[in-house]
């Protein structure tokens, strides 16, 4: 069912109200009160619509209406409420006593809206005009005539900075490819440091092997010369192998795998790595001077037997580093050349006691 119209349109007056029409409306409402707007035009003798009479009374003729200019406080309230409520003027009018919604709407359109635009603020969104230009761009892009390149540009520009993919990923890949070796395998920094440490340990182990092999060979020669069983042939490699393998077995528990591999690569039994050729020839040459007086050698250390025993132990069991640093090749040749004379001296002096590390030799010489 449709709503019945308040009045018939025939013969009704439209346009501005005259002063006579205002007096008739004021006197009727003053006598009968508000309400019944459909019957008021006929009862008051007005050729107006009932709606027109209501709006004229509410917005202009009502005595409680506040007239005059809006204050600065009222302007701020209107701007704040319009930013949150929009064009709902009746809601805004509730927060401004004695002000009508029509008056607030007219004041907004004639004064406040223009003032905000002069300040660079969008009167619709209440934001700066520069940032409010994006919606127009989006509307143009949503049209069917927009190209794909424009849409892609708008997406990249509207994307937040943190959500964009980092451009440094390609640089990281290029750095990894630069670090790769010629055959295509990547180089790792940890493997390089391990190789450096392995080289240092291998060089140190080789030096220790050489010194240890020389020390064991000198001890074997001294013990054999004291027994008088040293042959005229060159010392075989088997004697070096026995002494060297025992030393390696004792050190296997405390050494790591890299040191064992390094010892396996190095051949400690080759004549070139242990002794030069002139040293081996010197050890095999046993035509020593028989007239050497060894009693003079021990007399310079003292007259008592205790000092003689300590001096011999110091000579025979000296540290390996001392032999390498202080004993030259010529000194070793002289010492080896006098081994047979020492054995004769030991046989003549029955009070001398000698202790050796080898299990195959006797503990004391009498």
Curated annotation (Swiss-Prot):
Q: Where is this region: Disordered?
A: 124-170
On induction, the UniProt comment says:
Slightly induced by glucose, gibberellic acid (GA), jasmonic acid (JA) and salicylic acid (SA). Transiently induced in inflorescence by mechanical stimuli such as touch or wounding, including herbivory-wounding. Up-regulated by sulfur-deficient stress.
Show the InterPro entries listed in the entry. Answer: Homeodomain-like_sf (IPR009057), Myb_dom (IPR017930), Myb_TF_plants (IPR015495), SANT/Myb (IPR001005)
Keywords attached to this entry = DNA-binding, Nucleus, Repeat, Transcription, Transcription regulation
> Any idea which residues the entry calls the DNA-binding region?
37-61, 89-112
SMART domains attached here?
A: SANT
* Listed name of the protein: Transcription factor MYB28
Give the source species: Arabidopsis thaliana (Mouse-ear cress)
Kindly list the organism's lineage: Eukaryota, Viridiplantae, Streptophyta, Embryophyta, Tracheophyta
């Amino acid at each position: 069912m449709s709503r019945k119209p308040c009045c018939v349109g025939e013969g009704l007056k439209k346009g501005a109200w005259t002063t006579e029409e205002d007096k008739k409306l004021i006197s009727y409402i003053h006598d009968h009160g508000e309400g019944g707007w459909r019957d008021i035009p006929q009862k008051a003798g007005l050729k107006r619509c009932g709606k027109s009479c209501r709006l004229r009374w509410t917005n202009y003729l009502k005595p409680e209406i506040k007239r005059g200019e809006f204050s600065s406080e009222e302007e701020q309230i209107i701007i704040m409420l319009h930013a949150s409520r929009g064009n709902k003027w009746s809601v805004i009018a509730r927060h401004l006593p004695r002000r009508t919604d029509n008056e607030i709407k007219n004041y907004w359109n004639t004064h406040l809206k223009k003032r905000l635009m002069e300040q660079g603020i969008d009167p619709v969104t209440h934001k700066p005009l520069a940032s409010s230009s994006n919606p127009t761009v989006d509307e143009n892009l949503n049209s069917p005539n927009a190209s794909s390149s424009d849409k892609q540009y708008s997406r990249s520009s509207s994307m937040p900075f943190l959500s964009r993919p980092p451009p440094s990923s390609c640089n990281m890949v290029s750095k990894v490819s630069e670090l790769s070796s010629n055959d295509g395998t990547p180089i790792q920094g940890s493997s390089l440091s391990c190789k450096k440490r392995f080289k240092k340990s291998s060089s140190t182990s080789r030096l220790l092997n050489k010194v240890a092999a020389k020390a064991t060979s000198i001890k074997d020669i001294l013990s054999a010369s004291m027994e008088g069983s040293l042959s005229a042939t060159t010392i075989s490699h088997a004697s070096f192998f026995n002494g060297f393998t025992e030393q390696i077995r004792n050190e296997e528990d405390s050494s790591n795998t890299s040191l064992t591999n390094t010892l396996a690569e190095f051949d400690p039994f080759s004549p070139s790595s242990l002794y030069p050729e002139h040293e081996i020839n010197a050890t095999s040459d046993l035509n020593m001077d028989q007239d050497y007086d060894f009693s003079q050698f021990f007399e310079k250390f003292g007259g008592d037997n205790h000092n003689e025993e300590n001096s011999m132990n110091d000579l025979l069991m000296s540290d390996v580093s001392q032999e390498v640093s202080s004993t030259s090749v010529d000194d070793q040749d002289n010492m080896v050349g006098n081994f047979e004379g020492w054995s004769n001296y030991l046989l003549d002096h029955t009070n001398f006691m000698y202790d050796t590390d080898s299990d195959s030799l006797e503990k004391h010489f009498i």
